[in-house]
Amino acid sequence: MNDFERFGRNVVRTFYDPPPCNESNEPIWLLGQRYDSRPPLPKPAPSDSSTTATATAQAERNEDESWIRTSIDDKERKEAPNGEDPTQYGNWPSAFLDDFESRVWMTYRSGFSPIQKSQDPKATSAMSFRVRMQNLASPGFTSDAGFGCMIRSGQCILANALQILRLGRDWRWQENHADKDHAEILSLFADDPQAPFSIHRFVEHGAAVCGKYPGEWFGPSAAARCIQDLANKHREAGLKVYVSGDGADVYEDKLKQVAVDEDGLWQPTLILVGTRLGIDKITPVYWEALKASLQIPQSIGIAGGRPSASHYFVGVQGNNFYYLDPHSTRPLLPFHPPSLAAATSDTPNLTASTTSVSSTTSSTTIVPPADSIPAPSDPRQSLYPPSDLSTCHTRRIRRLQIREMDPSMLLAFLVTSEADYQDWKEGVQGVQGKSVVHVQDKEPPPRGQEREGAIDEVESWDEDGLQ
């Protein structure tokens, strides 16, 4: 994209998608954390009326200035991350902005090694018109623009779950402070076939298991299945994944089969619930429960948004949902293995060419040898320069009203212990309106496999016995 095209896109975005301002007094929730929309006014000290009025006015002015300030330290950060103008953030609590910016933001990327197209004649018709046109003369996809937004939203869910699990919920991103653990998490999602949670891995697995052609848009179900299977393959991440299936029912017996190890200990588990809360729009009876899903401490967010345009929702205020938008194309995030030891201890198939074929799709991903990627000279240093890390964070808030959201979505929760699970269970069940997650003790048997002998317990009635 040249400068003129970039300027034109920014102009259009300014008029049609202006940065939202905080105009509500309702509290703001972000993945279980509450932020007051307005700072409490200081109590005036007893004094004469003229002095009190002057002091109060000055205090309110100072509060307003500190409340809309977006930098951590004016001397260390002259502008918001990614070159964005701090003046666009109107009246938002700075603590909320810091938290929002600390969430991992995955977007479209370009310039990565090609993802080969499927040779199936049906593959072209499965792509959108935009994807077909922009890849017409190319044998593979070097960008996921136009089809990868649900994959990127799924990466957001998985990356933020790992970040909270490893760094804690209170960890905050600082542009000028390198964090090795944070960089190692991002390296898992690098745009390279060697990265276990890369766009290449998602597309490859979607073709092999979910019936999704390379270049075809994923739905919530396919994204959840890929997250689960890729996490199972990369056990070093230390995260189990449970997927509810086709509905909003979470079966406790099946969940514990995933979450509880052989010693009876609960392992950190990501619960993914794919659901549909209406036909064209979200039915109002679900509104309060959907808001509550972002207010409980176990929340990892929601992947969904508009039809064929997924977003990653992390916050809510009243009927407004705040999200990170993947529809912004950036250069690829390169892959840097955490260390030479880690690079050589990966599974063997990461250092060779891999091919996946299913009955409906086929794709080939060429994986370069692990030793062709340089490892950092000092394993204690960050794997990435700040310029790379900053592409995975933003303070740019986007907002969507609940009545405008698509009803099909993927809800995500992280439970780390048995007690945490019980708290989550109470949280999703004790909501106003109709619940968006249903917890059942056991999965019912498939139709036709009901309990033997049940038919003998049914009383028979003849016509004479009817009253």
Curated annotation (Swiss-Prot):
Listed GO biological process terms: aggrephagy; autophagosome assembly; mitophagy; piecemeal microautophagy of the nucleus; protein processing; protein transport
Region of interest called Disordered, as start-end residue ranges on this chain: 32-93, 343-390, 429-467
Matches recorded under InterPro entries: Papain-like_cys_pep_sf, Peptidase_C54, Peptidase_C54_cat
Compositional bias segments (type: Polar residues): 343-352
Listed EC numbers: 3.4.22.-
Keywords assigned: Autophagy, Cytoplasm, Hydrolase, Nucleus, Protease, Protein transport, Thiol protease, Transport
Acidic residues bias spans: 455-467
The UniProt record lists the keyword Hydrolase: yes
Domain of life where this protein originates: Eukaryota
Top enzyme class: hydrolase
Gene Ontology molecular function: cysteine-type endopeptidase activity; protein-phosphatidylethanolamide deconjugating activity
Regions of compositional bias (Basic and acidic residues) in chain numbering: 60-81, 439-454
Record localization: Cytoplasm; Nucleus; Preautophagosomal structure
GO cellular component: cytoplasm; nucleus; phagophore assembly site
Ranges in coiled-coil conformation: none
Comp. bias (Low complexity): 353-379
Reaction equation(s) it catalyzes: [protein]-C-terminal L-amino acid-glycyl-phosphatidylethanolamide + H2O = [protein]-C-terminal L-amino acid-glycine + a 1,2-diacyl-sn-glycero-3-phosphoethanolamine
Catalytic residues (positions): 149 (nucleophile), 325, 327
Function: Cysteine protease that plays a key role in cytoplasm to vacuole transport (Cvt) and autophagy by mediating both proteolytic activation and delipidation of ATG8. Required for selective autophagic degradation of the nucleus (nucleophagy) as well as for mitophagy which contributes to regulate mitochondrial quantity and quality by eliminating the mitochondria to a basal level to fulfill cellular energy requirements and preventing excess ROS production. The protease activity is required for proteolytic activation of ATG8: cleaves the C-terminal amino acid of ATG8 to reveal a C-terminal glycine.
Assigned protein family: Belongs to the peptidase C54 family.
Protein name per its UniProtKB record: Probable cysteine protease ATG4
Organism for this UniProt entry: Phaeosphaeria nodorum (strain SN15 / ATCC MYA-4574 / FGSC 10173)
